Amino acid sequence: MARIAGINIPPHKHAEIGLTAIFGIGRNRARKICDASGIAYSKKIKDLTDGDLEKIRVQIEQFTIEGDLRRETTMNIKRLMDIGCYRGFRHRRGLPVRGQRTRTNARTRKGPRKGAAALKK
């Protein structure tokens, strides 16, 4: 099993798909990494040589991924909440941030419905 950036990449998947197991790498970025490394998208992870894996590691080091990316995202949201802007307020209240309606829908962000009894209290 190949290990890249502290993540075990599924060996039976194609290189393009397997790289998406790393947080911060989607299909588009995985294709760019494969192109820069000279690896075919359809090549299975288990068929990659150590040299190929090292080329991929070198390419991935150019991007912010995994823990660093999660930390950066969290810090950006925290900064918005600290400066007291509208977006920070919406994050703090657990409501949609990008202008979506909340009278109906928005259940993903607001959580499960509160019954009529809970609203009367």
Curated annotation (Swiss-Prot):
InterPro entries named among the record's database cross-references: Rbsml_uS13_C, Ribosomal_uS13, Ribosomal_uS13-like_H2TH, Ribosomal_uS13_bac-type, Ribosomal_uS13_CS
UniProt cross-references to Gene3D superfamilies, sorted A to Z: 1.10.8.50, 30s ribosomal protein s13, domain 2 (4.10.910.10)
Keyword set, alphabetical order: Ribonucleoprotein, Ribosomal protein, RNA-binding, rRNA-binding, tRNA-binding
Protein function: Located at the top of the head of the 30S subunit, it contacts several helices of the 16S rRNA. In the 70S ribosome it contacts the 23S rRNA (bridge B1a) and protein L5 of the 50S subunit (bridge B1b), connecting the 2 subunits; these bridges are implicated in subunit movement. Contacts the tRNAs in the A and P-sites.
Gene name as annotated: rpsM
Keyword RNA-binding: yes
Subunit: Part of the 30S ribosomal subunit. Forms a loose heterodimer with protein S19. Forms two bridges to the 50S subunit in the 70S ribosome.
Name of the protein described by the UniProt record: Small ribosomal subunit protein uS13
Region ranges (Disordered): 94-121
NCBIfam families tied to this protein: uS13_bact (TIGR03631)
Domain of life: Bacteria
HAMAP family: Ribosomal_uS13 (MF_01315)
GO biological process, one term: translation
PANTHER family: 30S RIBOSOMAL PROTEIN S13/40S RIBOSOMAL PROTEIN S18 (PTHR10871), SMALL RIBOSOMAL SUBUNIT PROTEIN US13M (PTHR10871:SF1)
GO cellular component terms, A-Z: cytosol; small ribosomal subunit
Molecular function in Gene Ontology: rRNA binding; structural constituent of ribosome; tRNA binding
Keyword check for ATP-binding: no
Family: Belongs to the universal ribosomal protein uS13 family.
